[in-house]
Amino acid sequence: MKYVEHCDVSHGRKACYLSTIKKLRRYELFKREFEGQKDFNLYPDTFTIDDLYDFYEYVENEYIYYDEHYDWYRQFHIDKKPPIKYTNNYMQTVRSHFRAFMNWMTKNGYSSNMEYKKLTIKPDVYADPIYLTLEERDKVYYTDLTKHPGLSLYRDMFMFQCLVGCRVSDLYAFTTRNITEDGFIEYLPQKTRENAVEGAPSSFCRVPLNDKAKEIIERNMDKRSGRLFPYRNKNMYAYGIKMLLLLCEIDRMVTARDPDTKEFTRYPLYMVATSHTARKTFIANIYKKVKDPELICSMTGHMPGSKSFRRYRHIDDDCKWDALEGIE
């Protein structure tokens, strides 16, 4: 816990570290309870690389142990967020957390055990980002929803996200105060505020509003409260997006992780679309037009050089042809 208190990272990252620490504690108690090692402890000074791999195997299989020993796990009060089958990327993150902790321990003289340096941490693996092409986006925008009026608001919300690249949490918070006289929408992303590290630069977003975005605001703005969109339950919004894209026949096959097996599988786009698909649509299509990450980051809230930004845009063959045309 002392490490979490002293490390200079965001609140979100600290929460991730605490989650890994809790897994370590459950692992120690599990070994004592079910494997007969009554005095088992994973001490920083004495653990071996085999102990670490045994811990990672425990984390990978904890969702199975949770079902088998449910009554025992009740003491940890994790019913609302029980263990699941984790992706390889998540498991690499757990390893990174442990390595960061041990780096801190050795740097500050709390341990001289270098076994953790034998850990191999593989790079994360992601499928290509899932987003709508401009043609698909406009097809959704112009589809006649007269017979499906319940989807009209969801369409406007989703399209607005496609046009300004905001997260759903920011979409719900927008008011007329976010709109400038020169036709921009300005805001500090909620995620940035929640995860801010003291002294770190903020990621203020300023995005021009095109005619489509202005039309959507005009249709939905509450003039009394100033809110740009009425609140809708996020689960209903997520469901509405899928129904909207199904109705609009946005059924191009894409690759995404199966939520149960965690393996990459092919799906029609409408089945895996979420509000975040709109954000990816904004980023990916702008990147095709203007391959300037810093310009795009100024509109999305990503920090320049952000690793996560790479997961939003896809360098396809058209991008490569455009690049080569510049040196012909």
Pin down the residues of each PLM region.
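Short, Lys/Arg-enriched alpha-helical recognition elements, typified by the DNA-recognition helix
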Residues: 1-104
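Short, charged hinge/linker segments at domain and secondary-structure junctions
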Residues: 34-35, 46, 70-71, 103-128, ...
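Basic, Lys/Arg- and aromatic-enriched nucleic-acid-binding interface segment
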Residues: 81-96, 107, 111-168, 172, ...
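Catalytic-site neighborhood detector that most strongly recognizes the C-terminal catalytic loop/helix
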Residues: 131, 189-193, 234-237, 300-326
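DNA/chromatin major-groove-contacting recognition/catalytic segments
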Residues: 140, 197-198, 202-208, 219, ...
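Short, basic (Lys/Arg/His-rich) helix/loop patches that form interaction surfaces
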Residues: 146-148, 222-227, 242-298, 302
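Conserved tyrosine-mediated DNA breakage-rejoining catalytic core shared by Y-recombinases
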Residues: 164, 173-218
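Short, polar N-cap/turn motifs at the start of nucleic acid-interacting alpha helices
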Residues: 178-183, 291-311
